[in-house]
Amino acid sequence: MGDNPWVLQEQVLVELSEVIKNSLSENSQTRNAALNLLEKAKDIPDLNNYLTCILINATELSVSIRSAAGLLLKNNVRVSSLESGSGLQSLDYTKSTVIRGLCDPEQLIRGISGNVITTIISRWGISTWPEVLPQLMEMLSSPASTTQEGAFSALTKICEDSAQELDRDFNGTRPLDFMIPRFIELARHENPKIRTDALFCLNQFVLIQSQSLYAHIDTFLETCYALATDVSPNVRKNVCQALVYLLDVRPDKIAPSLGSIVEYMLYSTQDSDQNVALEACEFWLAIAEQPDLCSALGPYLDKIVPMLLQGMVYSDMDLLLLGNDADDYDVEDREEDIRPQHAKGKSRITLNTQGPITQQGSSNADADELEDEDEDDDEFDEDDDAFMDWNLRKCSAAALDVLSSFWKQRLLEIILPHLKQSLTSEDWKVQEAGVLAVGAIAEGCMDGMVQYLPELYPYFLSLLDSKKPLVRTITCWTLGRYSKWASCLESEEDRQKYFVPLLQGLLRMVVDNNKKVQEAGCSAFAILEEQAGPSLVPYLEPILTNLAFAFQKYQRKNVLILYDAVQTLADYVGSALNDKRYIELLITPLLQKWSMIPDDDPNLFPLFECLSSVAVALRDGFAPFAAETYARTFRILRNTLYLITTAQNDPTVDVPDRDFLVTTLDLVSGIIQALGSQVSPLLAQADPPLGQIIGICAKDEVPEVRQSAYALLGDMCMYCFDQIRPYCDALLVDMLPQMQLPLLHVSASNNAIWSAGEMALQLGKDMQQWVKPLLERLICILKSKKSNTTVLENVAITIGRLGVYNPELVAPHLELFYQPWFEIIKTVGENEEKDSAFRGFCNILACNPQALSYLLPMFVLCVAEYENPSAELRDMFQKILQGSVELFNGKASWQASPEVLAQIQAQYGV
């Protein structure tokens, strides 16, 4: 536009100003007419120029009209379809003019002008507007404080959103090289707003470890120390933030002054300003991640602990945000209180003797390990208050949690007198904080707490009768944290004294009349289910009666937690639920929900996940419900795939949530596991065939869809191979990239590896052409030091299974993988998967007996540790052991200890 400068048409400006004015009218008819005109005005090519003109130049208009024009401008820029390069020339007038808005006497205009600037930069990058940074930095030298504040309103947002982009060269110069020294200088400005903003900007570059900041890090630290007692709480907050950030990325700079910094943070965590206190409290969380520095906190623990306890007491503001504590079970949830639903996806993990009694895995730890590889951890949240932001109470509890994990008994000795004082307080808020503190130290101080639990348990159970819902809520959480102790009691007398009352108490809380208590009770009960497992079987009738009643009583939000409790129960007690009395109690409320939710409602996700676990647990007890469940599930699965395909060619069609694929695939898996080989007639009706659908889902761009597709594939191989056989070669082609290092999504790769092993058992000799490409990838994963433990277990099992029918193809490669294979396989729990893997390995050895010369000691050790092999495997072990004695003239080549030799002699007579 340089050759054709924009010419303003006064009449258009006047008319647009009038329309904006009318859009703010209290008269709804006038307002709606104006809003319609503004919608049509979006077609005007130079609309943004007119809006800029009204925002910046039309000082004769009211601030409300100018600010409305600015907001329209910002939104237009945010959703603009302009491309970088020549397409951005239409913003030239806006870019050259909006800067002046930062000098406007009206704070609102300055703020909106800054928002427009930062929106342009965040949308297209600093490189498309390089001159803006020198202009903004120059404005910081203005004698007018309003101009400086205006410049910083833009700079703070730019530094926050674009720190990484700023930390590189533009045309041979690095912006931060001149920005950071100036920010450090301005951090001592007489205006507290300028000091606050300067520090805020500097803090953004600590986190990204900018070398431009590190060049001035000592000066930066000196500045922080100088501002530590600033009169402005916002400055003090940013000082605390700077020290916490430095603790994370440059602990070497914190260490020399640690004592002074600890004293400062002790003081600041008790600051009357909650924002300062919260930022300072983050220090105690951060220092626990630095063992060398945390070990120096010993002399300060007697100050830190009571300070954190005080921070855990509900403030008046906390209670105000929480609202009333009346019985509210019959009050309908607001839409904004309900979290969006997302599918979890199932991971196939090796079956051990502990943990969930389902095909889905051996223990929660294994499943959690896979999830940790694929996603971020959630924050510590002591009572899961979705209605409250991260605050001093939660931060204090989290800090106590991590510090107790580091200091253990030392911290327990310090906190016990304070806990006694809190728990016996007549102030319910102090008492409640004491209960929270006991829960917070559960993980770190469990060993030391055990001696006090017989006394504490009855006290906590009595608090479940408190008139204060918040006390009942936190007591549920804390009891959940210590439920393992009650679940592991051996004597029947102790179980009747502690475990049964705990079970009864939590079940009462599950059906409490307060929604927050229901939520906490249900969550704590789900934890108890995990800890107690099969020990709950004698109590299934009262458990299911309560859960069924809860389905009738709960509003929408808590029903989601209830699904999780039912799912966990099914996972941990398994086929014990397959009883007519239990099935009716369990299935009736689930089918009621099933009938109420439409096919396109995301509220189906948790219901489908729950039903999948219930189906697996009920086994043939689920048969009466299988046909109807499968028909609807398959319909949703097929329709979702159709809509995804249609949306690729038709932009008017909304792309459906792929979680519909994840949950339907998982529910079909559950039905297959429930019915076993009896499922084939049901699946045979599928149109298109399930094999084709798995093939499509196995190539999906969303890894969770691939993860569930491979889980279903493995289940079909196990129970109804005839339905999947025609598609095996095509599926194996798509499976190979999932096993290529680096594994882009661990859970999807894990399930692909597991399903390949299941397929190998079914295909037999027809697997031959796939053995080499699979083995190449599996050996690479097996030898990778960074591989996930669960993945490695499935790799070892699948390699072994490749040898069941095709040992001659695996045998030549034995030397490449035997060592890590033995190391991994001996950690796998004894089950059919491990047994089949070892049978395959024995076949491989039979094809390459020379390998005994280098692997015999490891083989002998694994055999000695294998307690209950199948009869077939025991026979194979015996023959190899006997053969090795004959081949090497005795047992010396075993290099075994006397204990191992005795074990082999006892088991195999060799």
Swiss-Prot record:
Residues 349-364 have a biased composition (Polar residues). Disruption phenotype: Severely impaired growth at 32 degrees Celsius. SUPFAM superfamilies: ARM repeat (SSF48371). Residues 366-381 have a biased composition (Acidic residues). Residues 34-122 form the Importin N-terminal domain. It comes from the Eukaryota. Residues 333-381 are annotated as: Disordered. GO terms for biological process: mRNA transport; protein import into nucleus. InterPro entries: ARM-like, ARM-type_fold, Importin_beta. One of its GO terms (cellular component) is mitotic spindle midzone. The keyword Protein transport applies. Keywords: Cytoplasm, mRNA transport, Nucleus, Protein transport, Repeat, Transport. HEAT repeats lie at residues 12-39, 44-82, 93-126, 132-169, 177-207, 220-247, 259-286, 302-406, 414-442, 454-481, 499-532, 540-573, 581-619, 627-677, 690-721, 729-764, 772-807, 815-848, 857-888. One of its GO terms (molecular function) is nuclear localization sequence binding. Interacts with Ran; interacts specifically with the GTP-bound form of Ran (GTP-Ran), protecting it from GTP hydrolysis and nucleotide exchange. Interacts with nucleoporins. PANTHER family: IMPORTIN BETA (PTHR10527). Functions in nuclear protein import as nuclear transport receptor. Serves as receptor for arginine/glycine-rich nuclear localization signals (rg-NLS) and PY-NLS in cargo substrates. Its predominant cargo substrate seems to be mRNA-binding proteins. Mediates docking of the importin/substrate complex to the nuclear pore complex (NPC) through binding to repeat-containing nucleoporins. The complex is subsequently translocated through the pore by an energy requiring, Ran-dependent mechanism. At the nucleoplasmic side of the NPC, GTP-Ran binding leads to release of the cargo. Belongs to the importin beta family. Importin beta-2 subfamily. This is Importin subunit beta-2. The lineage of its organism: Eukaryota, Fungi, Dikarya, Ascomycota, Taphrinomycotina. The gene is kap104.
